Amino acid sequence: ISNKTPRQSIKNGFAMLTEERRATGIFPYASILFNTVISNLGSYKKGPLLSDKKMASDTDWSISSMHIKTPSQKTLIKNLSGGNQQKVILGRWLLTKPDVLLLDEPTRGIDVGAKYEIYELILQLAREGKAVMMVSSEMPELIGICDRILVMSNGHMAGILERGKDFGGIENEQETIMRLAAQYV
């Protein structure tokens, strides 16, 4: 896989939710509509212009399907809670119709209710056949969601655990995960 630009990555079916949503995920002084459609502008072309109707429709879909709490698509994203900001970003990426989602700390800094909704979305995407790769520093999150956990230690792959196969399953293997994580320290 050789994706040299974000545009090429999107074209090849990849989407990435970054760890630092405020620094690299959102345009804080732009609307929810802008933040929703920015990664998919090519699909809104109507001659030399953009289709306002399609952008509004896709933003409505994102607000509805992601359960984003907002009074309007015109609301500045900086005025939303962290969880709702994260859901706007996820909706943005889903509109690109990715096959592979890279989620870096997808629930960092968001409330419990939004975490649950994001967990449900991740599981739904996996059921639909999407590849979801998640980076998380929260072990219960990994154990609760992942079918497979790759453990890194000091830049080295220390091991892979699979639900129901290795060491009696990852559900009860926090100790094994911690041991692997410390392997190359």
Give names to the regions the model predicted.
Residues 1-185:
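Glycine-rich phosphate-binding loops of nucleotide-dependent enzymes
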